Amino acid sequence: MTQPAPFVSDPEILSGAVCFTGTRVPVSALMDYLQAGDRIDDFLDDFPTVSREQVGAVLRLAGEAVMQHARSA
């Protein structure tokens, strides 16, 4: 059984911003927290509708995208 995508973009939710699946929390909020030096636990405390598994999946996908970009450069 495949896991649902950790994020979606729906024009009806936050004008199509990429959000964690099943929430109205934009993935950019996680990136903002991390760039500010905040911990993942802080993000999860502030956005309880997002699961740790969703955060992990987004970070894995972001890491894979960076590696793929580096290989193609």
Q: For each of these PLM feature ranges, what is it?
A:
Residues 25-73:
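Long, charge-rich, low-complexity alpha-helical segments
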Residues 2-41:
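A short, structured beta-strand/loop element
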